[in-house]
Amino acid sequence: MSESKPTLRREQIASMNIHYIMWSLDYFLDVQQRLGFESIELWCAEPHVTLDHTGYFEAEVLAKKAADRGLRYRTLCPENVVYPWQYCARKPLHEQRSLAYFKHGIELAEVLGCDRMSVNSGWGDWDEDREEAWKRSREHMSILAEYAGEHGLVLTMESLRPEESNLVTTVSDAKRMIDEVASPYLQPMVDTTAMGVAGETLEDWFAAFGDGAIHEMHFIDGDPYGHLVWGDGKHDMEISD
């Protein structure tokens, strides 16, 4: 009798509202309830969530919207690619406001009962030395990981595509950053689009970090670019026994 392969269970999946930016948060949550999902990765940007460097807002409203539908927020994802805050901000005022923004994200995640907040390395200026930018990103990750630990959370760090960052864009970059920060509150996360663009596989990530180290991923297909429905792209999802 052949051994059955592991299957992905619906309760393992946290749906994400970034795909519903043109709809209200109520509409998104209604759809997730109807589809039978149980948990949410909350992307924090308007028109769904108000979060900035001055604080977080309407946490009670957000919590009630999920609870009324039998849903829970499992991960919080503060927008930082198209918004003015990023993890490797160089200018002092930008750095100060970015760190404040992400700390408020951690606080909101705690209030909403999340287990994790998803992060990335940010990016250095293209005209500065990469290692100098790397040091700054590492310092900021260390500050935020410590703050996350104080609030009962773990940060999960994904890689980015080369046009999004000149820092962590590969599994080896992610391994280096996480090893150098050396905090139990900073853990790896796989983004399958960045993984596919880098020509990597899930096996590469599991081999780099070991069994049980990866608890979260952005699970999407691509060609290798794009954010496609699973099966519409070409990402390698085969895992050896």
What are these regions (language model features)?
Residues 1-36, 63, 67, 113, ...:
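Histidine-acidic metal/acid-base catalytic patches
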Residues 3-6, 27, 68, 85-187, ...:
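Active-site acidic/histidine proton-transfer and metal-coordination neighborhood
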Residues 18, 51-52, 95, 134, ...:
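A generic secondary-structure micro-motif detector
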Residues 19-21, 44-46, 79-82, 121-125, ...:
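Active-site-proximal loop/turn and secondary-structure-junction residues that shape catalytic pockets
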Residues 43-66, 121-128, 228:
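Glycine-rich, proline-tolerant flexible connector loops at the mouths of alpha/beta enzymes
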Residues 48-51, 74, 82-86:
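Short active-site-adjacent helix-start/loop capping segments
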Residues 66-74:
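Glycine-rich, aromatic-flanked loop segments that form ligand/cofactor-binding clefts
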